Structures are given as C-alpha cells and as structure tokens.
Design a protein with these regions (language model features):
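A short acidic, helix-capping loop that chelates divalent metal ions and anchors anionic groups
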Residues: 74, 214-219
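Short loop/turn motifs at secondary-structure junctions and domain boundaries
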Residues: 48, 247-252
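Flexible, glycine- and charge-enriched loops at secondary-structure boundaries
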Residues: 76-84, 220
Length: 308
C-alpha cells in the first residue's frame, strides 16, 4: 500500500508552500494557483516571506584549514547540548521545515547524534554538510544512526578525491542519500570530471555552488551562468544535480534561509556575517519579523531570475 504523504503547509509572499518531510520535497504554488486551491482570494503581496531552512553551525572546530571557509577563525567556542536543544525548539516553534548541521565540522561534536535525535523529535527534517574525514572511522552503530536521522548528507569537495570517495562509500553502503557540495571556483573548476565520476559511482547528487570570495579573491569566482552551464551538462550526462540561488538569479537572504552560528547568533546568509539576533535571547519569530529588507550581496552580482 502506498504511504500517504503528510504535508506541512505555509502561506508566504510567493504563494502557498507544501513541504513533505519524508521525501523530502517542497511544492510551491503561485498566488494564482494558491487562490484556486483554497477557493479564496488572498493578497499574497501583503504577506511576508516564509523561512524554510536553517543552517546550524553546531561546531566551531574543524580538522581541515580551508582558506575560503565562510565561518573564519575556529576558536572552539560552542554552545552546550542544552543550549542547542533550546535553539532547535525555538526554530521548530517558528515553523522551520528543515535544518542542516554544519560547522566547522559537525561530526566532531560528541553530542551530534543527541542533537540529531532532538531535531527528529521536533518534526523538522535534518541534513548535514561534512568534509567526510570522520565518516569511515565511525562505528557500525553510528553509521546506522546517520541513516536514522539524516535525510541527506553532503560531502564538501576540497580537492581530495580519496577523502570524498571514502565518505561516499560509507553513505552508499548504509543507503544514506548523498551529495557533493562543489564550490565551483577557478581553482576547483579543473575537478569537474572527477566530481562527476564520483557522483556516478556512488549515486550522489552534485550541488554546484557559485564561489563566494569572502577573502575578496574575486579572480577565483566563475560567473554564475557558466556554473549553471556546467550543472546542465552534468544533468545531461544523467547525473543528479542541484544548484544554488545565484545560478538561477535568486538570493535567499532574508527570504527563505537563515544561518545560526556556534553561539546562537542568526545571520541572513552563511556568507553575510551581520547578526540579526540571538536565538538564546529572542524567539525566531521576533528575529525574522525584525530582519529588515534584503541587503545587496557583497559577493555575487545577481542576474534576472532564471528558470532551469
């Protein structure tokens, strides 16, 4: 018997959003489609945008030292398990659909699975971005826990195919949906075929990301339309692909996404480090309501929104 889907619904400036936690899948209805579905006329332009995703920097330590990391120096200052549980509850109460663990390196936290269990208890969906180094050394029970709690785990590409391959093998062996986060910089553009081959072999999705020059190394940035073309070619090669907002002319800052750092401060974007408030001191609803208008991105020049 086919399982009945249970959608969460939200009304936003763009229309009605339907989210299926199990898939996970998001269906977006235009204002016209939303009015037809509800048999009522709503003025969606008077509504606010709905925040769907929160990225949680649960760790401020890392076993790599990437110069392009958006969180900057890793000083090891982190919240306690209880404090992160409070933040997770705060986000769930605010209606967030999905959270993603990141860092730093999230797997370095000894309480990662306790936090993952708490996310599941709140009913939110959970993903993770990791550099993959620790996955092969996890115990069988820990690997099974990865499958239990995480809907998808993405391994970041840092020019070391062996690290990524070992991590992807763990995810494939335990039937955990996998992805490769591929920051498409000038330096890493050469790795495209290697990334695609790994994705094919391990049935992983490639997330093509426009490089954000946080160190003002704009020469490393490949234009968004070029990144999008590479993603399209990968899709034509029957590789599962996804792209970030800049690839399609969308900036999610203050519209659908927030980043929460290792001390509970909320940022409008992982790369724009201007705190909007702290989830240990304010409700998510209050922070979102007072966030103000979308700022101009200091790292990416957005083209007109595209459909791909």
């Amino acid at each position: 018997m086919e399982k009945t889907r249970k959608f969460k619904f939200a009304m936003s400036r763009d229309g009605i959003i339907a989210y299926d936690r199990e898939t996970p899948m998001t269906i977006r209805f235009t204002p016209e489609e939303s009015n037809e579905m509800t048999k009522k006329i709503y003025d969606y332009t008077s509504m606010d945008y709905y925040c769907e995703v929160a990225h949680l920097e649960i760790s401020n330590t890392c076993n790599m030292n990437c110069s392009y990391c958006y969180t900057g120096d890793k000083k090891g200052h982190e919240l306690t398990t209880i404090e992160w549980r409070m933040i997770i509850d705060n986000l769930a109460k605010g209606g967030i659909f999905q959270v993603s663990f990141g860092g730093g390196e999230p797997t370095l936290r000894k309480d990662m699975f306790l936090l993952a269990q708490h996310v599941a208890h709140t009913g939110m969906n959970l993903g993770m971005t990791t550099n993959g180094m620790t996955l092969p050394a996890m115990t069988p029970d820990e690997k099974r826990s990865l499958k239990t709690y995480f809907k998808q785990i993405n391994v970041s590409w840092h020019e070391d195919a062996k690290i990524v391959e070992r991590a992807l093998k763990v995810l494939k062996d335990f039937e955990i949906p996998a992805g490769i986060n591929y920051a498409f910089s000038r330096t890493m553009q050469k790795d495209n075929e290697v990334v695609k081959e790994l994705a094919k072999e391990y049935n992983a999705e490639v997330l093509y990301l426009v490089y954000k020059p946080i160190d003002l190394d704009f020469k490393e940035q490949v234009p968004a339309d070029v990144v999008r073309d590479y993603a399209q070619k990968a899709a034509n090669d029957r590789i599962k692909v996804a792209v970030d907002g800049p690839c399609v002319g969308q900036c999610l800052m203050k519209k659908k996404f927030i980043d929460v750092d290792s001390l509970g401060f909320v940022y409008p974007c992982s790369f724009v480090r201007k705190p909007l408030g702290n989830l240990l001191h304010s409700s998510f609803e209050a922070i979102w309501k007072s966030r103000g208008e979308q700022d101009e991105c200091p790292f990416v020049k957005f083209e007109k929104e595209k459909v791909v």
